[in-house]
Amino acid sequence: MELTTPTIFAIGILAFICEYVDATLGMGYGTILTPLLLLLGLAPLQVVPAVLFSQFLAGLAGGFWHHRLGNVAFDFRRDTNLSTGHPAKKLLARLGILGYLPRSRDAKVVYILGGCGIIGALAAVFLAVSIPERVQEGYIGGMLVALGFLVLATRRRKLSFSWSRLFFFGFLSAFNKGLSGGGYGPLVASGQLLSGTGSQTAVGNTTLSEAVVCLVGFLAYLATRGGVDWRLALPLAVGAVASTPLSAYTVRRLGERKLRALLAIAILALGAVTLAKVALS
């Protein structure tokens, strides 16, 4: 497909819309945008690195705006005062052997989830080859439906925050990423909600965590496949980044309860569509 000026403009608009959904709900950018670009006649070798690059930049911008508008509180300065008295804090203290742990809770969450996502992204190369695609998609779809129902069922309950549950969902998201290459965003978002994180905070944390994972995926793609079509990557990046202030503002205005319900519905819908795709294939 020839990338004319009108086409490039239309692609930028698509990226704006898809990233608005993603940075508002914590999921949907690659899931929606990649099939649309392929339907336009673009080759997968053009689309995949361009989407990863644009989502990396948009994730950074989204994290900045979510922090700026108060949806999250990121402080990535080194935490030098971590108490180890509580069992959950011991889990965090063990991460201290890495030489760095950020200060604020939201920054710690991004650190853990981003690290798990990186492990999963690298493991994807080795795990996905031996498992049938229908099995992978059926597993992811079923899990998302179950998590969506759980989030919906607990929407009126005040869940206490649990580092143990967060670690569990972090490693589960890494496993899913390694298994199928997908399911990271919705699982990380729903896992945070079920770990006692507020919905606004969960979206902001997911947005920045995905940026880290996309950067690793982009660099791995460059190392194994070669170059990037910047005529596609740049308009995608511009459109996606431009949507992030509006997304953060929307999250701020929606409030916790409405946003949690929207997240549950989005996770359920994504899981149902995935299962329907498996059933019809």
Regions found by a protein language model. Give the residues of each.
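Juxtamembrane transmembrane-helix boundary motif
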Residues: M1-T24, G30-Q46, G63-L179, A189-L194, ...
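Residue-level micro-sites within transmembrane alpha helices that shape
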Residues: C18-V21, S54, N176, S209, ...
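Transmembrane helix-bundle signature of multi-pass membrane transporters/permeases
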Residues: V48-F56, V203-A211, V241, I267
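Transmembrane alpha-helices of multi-pass small-molecule transport proteins
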Residues: A50-R68
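Core segments of transmembrane alpha-helices
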Residues: G117-G120, E210-L215
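Functional transmembrane core segments of multi-pass inner-membrane proteins
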Residues: L193, T197-G204
